[in-house]
């Protein structure tokens, strides 16, 4: 599970904070390209950040409006 907070879009780039398992002590600030989904900063590239990016990508397919917060769960 990953929780995303402070989701903001600036042109072709989205930034957000990803929290592994919702743990505030396991925060990763991620900046990624909307078109390529490529991480643009030195964020940890792990299953949590990738899942967060994928979730935001799917939200954008449904609506042009991004939420300020989102979550993604998997088994």
Feature names for model-found ranges:
Residues 1-5, 43-46:
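N-terminal start-of-chain detector that recognizes signal peptides
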Residues 2-33:
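N-terminal acidic leader/helix
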Residues 25-75:
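Acidic, low-complexity intrinsically disordered segments
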């Amino acid at each position: 599970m990953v929780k995303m907070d402070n989701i903001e879009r600036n042109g072709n780039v989205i930034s957000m904070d990803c929290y592994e398992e919702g743990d505030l002590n396991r925060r990763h600030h991620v900046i990624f390209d909307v078109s390529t989904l490529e991480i643009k900063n030195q964020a940890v590239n792990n299953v949590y950040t990738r899942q967060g990016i994928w979730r935001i990508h799917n939200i954008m397919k449904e609506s042009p409006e991004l939420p300020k917060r989102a979550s993604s769960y998997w088994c």
